[in-house]
């Protein structure tokens, strides 16, 4: 992209549209991996039962359903709070699916659902007002989306998280956490650090390679 590059390994689709079906895959609810498979299995069970993490996740499932309902119908939650393991964290993941109305374009569905609720919070418009008010720096590429759209209206964009922006010989990367009424500031800050672990590890490996 001219004088900059974006690269990473996003775990979350912003929205997927295929054959007039739209999907949103909310990811919310995060525990750190321990590096021990047996302990990670215990952590996964704890995550699936954690009231705060589940409440956070269901808020975003409801938001996804609301966003898709603007120009979609026959909405279903096809995957509900599935525990998924990533390199450094464990997440709860759902899949919300809806049929797109015949009169609605793919780009309208994208507009209805952007930005992802996992990056904004809910209610979405009020949350974005608070983000603009309280965040000290612009998000830039962070929380946007990148992917493709074909001539048949099929669309697949990943949310730009767990990703780098390379510009003018500097690497920029960000992470965040969703704050709810039961959140503890120290825990949310630790979640941010946990989400950055894979990127930090990638930089460490790159430095070793070029030594």
PLM-predicted stretches and their roles:
Residues 1-211:
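Extended alpha-helical targeting/anchoring segments
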